[in-house]
Amino acid sequence: MSGGLPGAGFALGYGTNGFTDHPLDDAITVLDRLGYRGIALTLGHPHLDPFDGEADRAAARLRRRFDDLGWRVVIETGTRYLLDPFRKHRPNLLDDDADLRELFLRRAIDLGAILGADCVSLWSGVLPDEVSPEAAHDRLRARLDGLVGRAEEAGVPLAFEPEPGMLVETVADALALRADLGDPDALGLTVDLGHCVVVEPDGVVGALRAAGPLLRNVQVDDMLPAAHEHLEFGHGSLDLAAALRTLDELDYRGLAAVELPRHAHDAPGVAARSMTALEHAWEAR
């Protein structure tokens, strides 16, 4: 299947966090058959464990397959419970002891280099108890600065993702953080279209335009305004056609990957319906 959207400069992909009941090779086979042209690879169980002694070799093998398929790849780092079996997404970059998170992100950068990834996507985390926003921002700037240096050395850009409920919640927050760091070339933005429904004051079009040329990665899903819950297209309030039109107007050339991490029970069906919805929205833009 040729796949893709006719005339689009960006590639459609799918997130592996929506295929956690499939071995990674099988997920790739399914997505290729459905017409996707890239993958957002979430590191950790069950697909590519960055702390496994064979991870580099596995990444090199994956790189060969992606190259054969002509696929784009981005690295996602939102694995639940990878670093702490009791606390989701902890430690984060705001915690007192963030060493394990920083190690994980350095491994993500290294694996991204092996895979030829467009970028490594990351986020701030929620504000820990008893840490002031000012102190948390100081920690984030200091720790992110070191990761930006690592990304520059590896030749793999970082893409910072604003997340509802986190310290860095909006595109404006992410742009301010980048400015605080001196606007490094190796630090761009990830924008999740569904998040825009929840937290962006100017909606999805305004958020994408604000990110503009700094946009390195796009996650595609629907949401309702009141809840940070990833939904299939048509089950939320996202104007998908307007979002795709804006990406086209911005001449976005990266990956736009569907992110539905709670839908693995019907992954092939969800991926097929998502492709159909994307094709219809593209035609309607």
Label each PLM-derived region with a short phrase.
Residues 34-48, 75-86:
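Short, conserved active-site loops that position catalytic residues or coordinate cofactors/metal ions
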Residues 1-13, 20-37, 60, 67, ...:
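Histidine-acidic metal/acid-base catalytic patches
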Residues 46-50, 83-87, 93, 128-133, ...:
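A short acidic, helix-capping loop that chelates divalent metal ions and anchors anionic groups
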Residues 52-59, 94-98, 130-137, 167, ...:
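Flexible, glycine- and charge-enriched loops at secondary-structure boundaries
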Residues 20-31, 42-45, 87-91:
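Alpha/beta catalytic barrel-like cores
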Residues 15-19, 42-46, 78-80, 125-127, ...:
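Active-site beta-loop-alpha junctions enriched in small/polar residues
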Residues 25-26, 67-68, 72, 82-188:
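Active-site acidic/histidine proton-transfer and metal-coordination neighborhood
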Residues 42-63, 124-128:
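Glycine-rich, proline-tolerant flexible connector loops at the mouths of alpha/beta enzymes
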